């Protein structure tokens, strides 16, 4: 091949490399995106405590964490007149290292779509369990062809409460100590009476361990079954939850607001809810208002979810939320006029109470937890046997001769 052909081939290769480099650089140019911020910072947030007692917790329920989603264009400017659809999912299921609410693992915690005139969507959500939450965000324009719709997936990792590690460490030490003492007693040299297969102390210890293990297994399973039975028996009484002080539908000052959706819920499954606002005279939707939604657990009065924003073009706000605590919840929606709206009125609200059916942890999760605790006791037992044998083992005669 001549020098001229080699130069042509080299030039073609360089041209292809330049084109590919330019294309890859263009494809990596940042486009529209969504930025997530939390208040307080996520490293200061802790999962919900099932029982916020001073003995086993902080003694109070923390307010929900504020999730702020801000949409930006390719130039880093806020996207105006956008509609943001948020889906919030909990961590994936892991029966080997479960959380306080295993039924909630791998489920959809929230699904809401709201208008964002400034490109920002804010919700307040109580996060029930530790782990990595997945936020699927879809941004579309309110005005047709204002910008290209896009989707983005964000991750939010919630650390575990440090108190849980402290209490777990204390429990492990107790179980290891019990096993260690048992192994120490079993490994001791004791005379076996005629007709006995083991010394009396060993037999008593083994019998006690068997009784404790059986009692623990029976307690874990019966308590769970009783909880399931109690919840199934209480299902007909779910309608007896005291009604809310405010009605679910109200006409006031020339406006009509109605809160509708599922009448009951079940832990681990999202409930569908909707609020609509209209003018009863013209039967037209009202959109120049601000809606504020608050979901409160009634037994301990902690806020599970809150949102504030305008309705859609049909005067409606629809959302799905999961109730991860098996207790009645109150949903309150208040409406107020926007600051620059021509229609001004006094704020009013509608509300309703929703009974929530609790679900006991799966049998698999309970058995795995019992197996972990049993394994810790067995490890302590083997360690006690080993230490006892080392103490009672006679010295090596060869070692004695070498010393003498």
Range-by-range predicted roles:
Residues 24-403:
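N-terminal soluble domains immediately following signal/targeting peptides that reside
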Residues 2-10:
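Bacterial N-terminal signal peptides that target proteins for export
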Residues 12-21:
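Bacterial N-terminal signal peptides
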């Amino acid at each position: 091949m001549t020098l001229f052909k080699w130069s042509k081939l080299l030039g073609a290769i360089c041209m292809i490399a330049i084109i590919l480099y330019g294309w890859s650089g263009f494809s990596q140019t940042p486009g529209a995106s969504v930025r997530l911020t939390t208040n307080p910072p996520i490293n200061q947030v802790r999962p919900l405590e099932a029982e916020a007692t001073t003995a086993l917790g902080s003694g109070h329920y923390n307010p929900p964490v504020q999730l702020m989603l801000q949409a930006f264009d390719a130039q880093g400017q806020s996207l105006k007149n956008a509609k943001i659809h948020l889906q919030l999912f909990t961590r994936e299921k892991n029966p080997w290292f479960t959380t306080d609410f295993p039924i909630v693992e791998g489920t959809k915690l929230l699904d809401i779509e709201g208008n964002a005139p400034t490109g920002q969507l804010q919700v307040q959500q109580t996060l029930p369990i530790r782990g990595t939450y997945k936020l699927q965000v879809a941004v579309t324009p309110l005005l047709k062809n204002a910008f290209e719709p896009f989707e983005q997936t964000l991750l939010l990792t919630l650390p575990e409460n440090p108190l849980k590690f402290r209490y777990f460490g204390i429990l492990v030490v107790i179980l290891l100590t019990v096993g260690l003492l048992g192994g120490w007693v079993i490994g001791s040299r004791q005379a076996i009476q005629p007709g006995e297969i083991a010394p009396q102390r060993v037999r008593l210890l083994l019998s006690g361990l068997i009784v404790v293990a059986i009692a623990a297994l029976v307690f874990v399973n019966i308590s769970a079954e009783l909880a399931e039975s109690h919840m199934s028996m209480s299902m007909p009484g779910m309608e007896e939850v005291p009604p809310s002080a405010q009605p679910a539908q109200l006409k006031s000052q020339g406006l009509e607001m109605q809160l509708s959706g599922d009448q009951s819920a079940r832990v681990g499954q999202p409930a569908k809810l909707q609020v609509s606002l209209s003018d009863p005279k013209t039967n037209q939707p009202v959109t120049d208002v601000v809606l504020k939604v608050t979901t409160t657990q009634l037994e301990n009065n902690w806020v599970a979810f809150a949102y504030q924003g305008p309705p859609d073009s049909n005067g409606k706000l629809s959302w799905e939320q999961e109730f991860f605590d098996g207790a009645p919840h109150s949903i309150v929606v208040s409406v107020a006029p926007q600051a620059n709206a021509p229609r001004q009125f006094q704020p009013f609200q509608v509300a309703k109470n929703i009974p929530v059916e609790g679900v006991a942890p799966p049998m698999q999760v309970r058995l795995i937890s019992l197996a972990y605790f049993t394994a810790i006791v067995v490890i302590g037992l083997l360690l006690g046997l080993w230490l006892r044998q080392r103490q009672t083992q006679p010295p090596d005669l060869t070692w004695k001769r070498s010393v003498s």
